[in-house]
UniProtKB/Swiss-Prot annotation:
Belongs to the universal ribosomal protein uS15 family. GO terms for cellular component: cytosolic small ribosomal subunit. This is Small ribosomal subunit protein uS15. InterPro entries: Ribosomal_uS15, Ribosomal_uS15_bac-type, uS15_NS1_RNA-bd_sf. The gene is rpsO. Gene3D superfamilies: 6.10.250.3130, S15/NS1, RNA-binding (1.10.287.10). CDD domains: Ribosomal_S15p_S13e (cd00353). One of the primary rRNA binding proteins, it binds directly to 16S rRNA where it helps nucleate assembly of the platform of the 30S subunit by binding and bridging several RNA helices of the 16S rRNA. Forms an intersubunit bridge (bridge B4) with the 23S rRNA of the 50S subunit in the ribosome. GO terms for molecular function: rRNA binding; structural constituent of ribosome. Keywords: Ribonucleoprotein, Ribosomal protein, RNA-binding, rRNA-binding. One of its GO terms (biological process) is translation.
């Protein structure tokens, strides 16, 4: 269910602040969002997979924390990120 190396590299290139940037909140949120979207398709077929559902909830929680951090540090970057990712906030 995880992302391939090429998908990860593409996300890092799109959302990174600089070359090779993997630690910025934008990159981390984009990677988590991509993983979450992949897992949602998995749960359409496997409704009783509660073990993976716990991992999904953990990823959603981590994304929420990173978004809250980014919103507190720089509101413009936060708003740009949620617009680019198409999140509901």
């Amino acid at each position: 269910m995880s992302l391939t190396t090429q998908e990860t590299a593409a996300i890092i290139a799109d959302y990174g602040v600089k070359e090779g940037d993997t630690g910025s909140p934008e990159v981390q949120v984009a990677l988590l969002t991509s993983n979450i979207n992949k897992l949602q398709g998995h749960f359409a077929d496997h409704k009783k997979d509660h073990h993976s559902r716990r991992g999904l909830l953990r990823m959603v929680s981590q994304r929420r924390k990173l978004l809250d951090y980014l919103k507190g540090k720089n509101v413009e970057r936060y708003q740009d990120l949620i617009k680019r990712l198409g999140l509901r906030r």
